[in-house]
Amino acid sequence: MAGPDIQLITPDSADDWQETRLILRDYANSLDVDLDFQGFEDELTGLPGAYAPPGGLMLLALVDGAVAGCGAFRPLLESDYANACEMKRLFVRPAFRRFGLGRVLAQALMDRATEAGYSAMLLDTLDDMEAARGLYESLGFVEVPPFYFNPIPGAHYLKAELGAFRPSYFG
C-alpha cells in the first residue's frame, strides 16, 4: 500500500497565497502567544514580502493535494552572523503530523537556502516545542545567543551551518 502523496510547492497564484495566509493563521493560533512583536498581521498582508526570491522562500507541503504544512526563510540582514537567513513559520497541521513533514520541510528549506548562497540558517523556538527542538538538533542546529529581541519567556535561539553534513530524511 502506497503512502500519501507529499509535494512541496512554492506559492505562485492568488489562491496559493490565500492558502498560505490560512495556514499561517493556523500556525499563529497554535502557539498561544501574541506575534504582534513580529509584525505578524503586516507579514500576512504583505506576502510574499521578505519570503520572496531570490533572498527568501515560502514552501507549502501538500498531502494528497491538501495544504498540510508550511515553512519559510528570509534574509537575516541585521545579525552577528554573516550571510545568514532565518527559518520562519515551520508548521504542520495536527491532522498531518507523524508523516515526517516537519523534517521534509526543514531540510528542504535548508537545502534551498544553501542553493541561494546562504552559509548559515538561524531560528528561534520555544521551550514547549520539544519535538521541534529535537528535529532542529537532528539537523545540526545548536544553541546560540539571541540574535533578535523575543519577549516570550523560554525562547531558544538556534543556528546551523549550511552545506554541512545532515542525515538525509530519504536515506
Question: What spans do the regions from the language model cover?
Answer:
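Acetyl-CoA-dependent GNAT
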Residues: L8-K88, R93-P94, A106-A108, R112, ...
